[in-house]
Each structure stands twice: as C-alpha cells, then as structure tokens.
Amino acid sequence: MREQFHRVIAIDGPAASGKSSVARGLARQLGFVYVNSGAIYRAITWHILQKKIHPEERERIADALQAADITCCLQDNESRILIDDVDPGEHLRDDCVNESVAGVSQFPVVRQIVAKKLHEHAQGHDLIVEGRDIGSVVFPDTPYKFYLNASPQVRLQRRAAQGGRDEIAIRDRVDSSRPVSPLVIAKDAHVIDTSHLTIQEVIEEIVGVLEKTGLRA
C-alpha cells in the first residue's frame, strides 16, 4: 500500500546555498514543521563516532544503527532528533562530525533509515524538508520541489561567516558522485540562485511559486 503523506515542500541544494535559513523561515511563515535532514545524518554520525566506530566500517555502522533507538520529536515546530534518548544537537557541528558526515551518509543503510524517519514525520505533519535528495529520492511525488544554489565564492563566504570549516569543494564532489542518492536537481524542481538574494527574497519567490500551484498555509 502506498504511504499517505501530508504536504511536503522539498528544498534541496549544496552546502551553504541558504537551505536552512530559507526552509526555517518558510516553515515559520506557512506554519509547517521544519525538518533539517542533514541534522539527522549528523546526529547519526555523532552517534557512530561516540561508539568508536570508524566512518568507513559499513557493517559495524549498520549493526549500531540497528540497535539504536532513533526518534524524531517536535520542539517549537521544528524537528529534533534523539538517539537512545540523547539529543546531540550541540555536537552536530563538531569538527569530527564535519569530517565524517559525508562518508557516513553515503551508505545505503544510513540513507534508508533517514528516509524512513522522514516518511514517518510526513504521515502526521505538513513538512518543509531541506536536504540534498529530498525532491529527487525521498519525496519524489511531492509537487513542491525547490533547488537552491549559489556561486562557490558566496557559499565559502557564508560558511566562513557561520564559523564553519567544511570543505565546500570536497563536500560537493562527494555529494554529487556518491552512487546512492547523489545531489541532483529533480527534473521538476524550481531552481533559485540565492547568490545575490536575501533570505526573505528567496522565501517570497518560493511562496509565489507555491501560490500558483494552489498551496496555502
């Protein structure tokens, strides 16, 4: 039987393209639940590292996740991830997580778990989900797909302003070349270059597209 989902707005794009700020602001404006799929991958990566498992040990990662209790809850209309009742939120941008998340997230078992959690969320709530494969893989049937991008220079500046140390070029290469759920533009996605737009300008463009499709808060 086909899963029945509430309304899902997919916002995909590479690192530092503005996904998080736009998705969070749009969710607040529309009254949808905001979900950062990348935070789920980062939480899983943090959990794996806490278990002293190397990011390339696929079988041990699979076993650890099979034994883990991974749940999503809501806080201020935003999704939070708990693993074995622990909220790793403050550790999601730790250097060790930054260095390992791309490797951990490429494994099919990890992506399947994240997709399952997102599907469970969508069975009970209207969602705005940001990620890299939301419109292309996780929710391919949603009519509300957006892909945000920006120039490499702008993205580097944004990441530096956030105090991050992610290697943008390396992450792009890994995201785009992985065999499972690579970063691609869904064929029916609305593409927005955010390089010279404010967050609110991007939100307004998305709202305009949504209104043309008949979606209202």
Show the residue positions of the predicted features.
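Walker A (P-loop) phosphate-binding loop of P-loop NTPases
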Residues: 16
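Conserved nucleotide-binding/hydrolysis micro-motifs of P-loop NTPases
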Residues: 40, 134-135, 149-157, 196-198
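ATP-dependent small-molecule kinase phosphotransfer cores
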Residues: 39-126, 138, 153, 165-170, ...
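Conserved lysine of the Walker
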Residues: 19
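Small-molecule kinase domains that catalyze NTP-dependent phosphoryl transfer to phosphate-bearing small molecules
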Residues: 73, 118-125, 132-141, 161-205
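Hydrophobic anchor at the beta1->P-loop junction of P-loop NTPases
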Residues: 11
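Hydrophobic positions on the alpha1 helix immediately C-terminal to the Walker A/P-loop
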Residues: 22
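Extreme N-terminal, non-catalytic leader segments
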Residues: 1-8
